Amino acid sequence: MHLNKLSLFNYKNFSEAGFDFDIKINCFVGKNGIGKTNVLDAIYHLAYGKSYFNPLAVQNIKHGEEFFVIDAELEKNDRTEQIVCSLKKGQKKVLKRNGKAYDKFSDHIGFIPLVIISPADRDLIVEGSETRRKFMDSVISQLDSTYLHQLIQYQKVIVQRNALLKYFALNHTFDNDTLSIYNEQLNEFGKSIFEKRKEFLEEFIPIFNVHHQAITGSEESVQLVYESHLFEKDLLTLLQENINKDRALHYTSSGIHKDDLSFEIDSHPIKKFGSQGQQKSFLIALKLAQFEFLKKQSGVKPILLFDDIFDKLDETRVAKIVEMVNSETFGQLFISDTHPERTEAIVKSTHQTYKIFNL
């Protein structure tokens, strides 16, 4: 699978731009603020139906304009496909495949397997548990549409249950029968999501460990630890036990929406005890493991986006990535960098075909 062409209209800082891509390596070089990352983000947008860097869709429209369009042609399974994502102010975003609009964006997730490695990934370490849950969910959802559906349904029920708890508080009333209906639904969806997260991590963690060892070449011990209330008790029991707490807080305090994926080094939080270099290695290993997991499960090499990562890597880690490109581990690769000479030297050393776009 690879992208052939990309056209942008009023997307972020681009009024209009078009690119014809190499099937292997494509580099976007230029000064900071010129739009290199925005091209990568447009490609991400096509895969996930949203920006990696700005979740507020309307803010991706070029300042002073009324709409944006991202239009791409790609080859997948020997077929040419057209994907178009567009948004007009005041209207819903539209995502089309070969001219036909998706009824639900979730039906598109997984059609373009894609992994991004970016300085923004540091949020996975420094931000709260929601960021790490989203990482888990995005990987699983690209391969399992049932999981994504269950996740969406679970989140809807959480919103409804929380609204009911607020209603009880405002009206000084309580109806356990109605609450029990939501509890049963959460238990049904939550149990399945919990089991699938466990299954995913059982396979993912060994892949992560291999990549971390390859990148660092060191003996330091790193861990991904899944934390969930459901290891202790089933969700129905937890919801019943915490009812007084939930009524006081006006929201649901236990469930898979509180899960976390703890990042550790030598059994301590890497956020506090890992150096910058150790944190970078951890995140790159995490994303390369995501790439390998998706490739293994789908049989398709995901598109890989490297956003400004050479600034953050020493020569040893760059050499490791070059080695992986040469081994045909990767499929199509998109790179952004501020240093044209460095970029060209790196891609030349891979002995693969490439294009460099000076923005």
Swiss-Prot record:
Xref: Pfam families: SMC_N
Binding positions (ATP): 30-37
Keywords: ATP-binding, Cytoplasm, DNA damage, DNA repair, DNA replication, DNA-binding, Nucleotide-binding, SOS response
InterPro entries named among the record's database cross-references: DNA-binding_RecF, DNA-binding_RecF_CS, P-loop_NTPase, RecF/RecN/SMC_N, RecF_2
A GO CC term assigned to this protein in UniProt: cytoplasm
Subcellular location: Cytoplasm
GO biological process terms held by the UniProt record: DNA replication; DNA synthesis involved in DNA repair; double-strand break repair; SOS response
GO terms for MF: ATP binding; single-stranded DNA binding
Principal subcellular localization: cytoplasm
Family: Belongs to the RecF family.
UniProt xrefs under HAMAP family: RecF
Record's function text: The RecF protein is involved in DNA metabolism; it is required for DNA replication and normal SOS inducibility. RecF binds preferentially to single-stranded, linear DNA. It also seems to bind ATP.
Name the record gives this protein: DNA replication and repair protein RecF
Gene name as annotated: recF
